[in-house]
Structures are given as C-alpha cells and as structure tokens.
C-alpha cells in the first residue's frame, strides 16, 4: 500500500 501507498499513501498520498
């Protein structure tokens, strides 16, 4: 997962 990536975060903005």
UniProtKB/Swiss-Prot annotation:
Keyword line: D-amino acid, Hormone
GO MF annotation, one: hormone activity
PTM sites of type D-phenylalanine: 2
Function: Neuroexcitatory peptide; increases the impulse frequency and produces a spike broadening of the identified heart excitatory neuron (PON); also enhances the amplitude and frequency of the heart beat. Has also an effect on several other muscles.
UniProt name for this protein: Achatin-1
Organism: Lissachatina fulica
């Amino acid at each position: 997962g990536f975060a903005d």
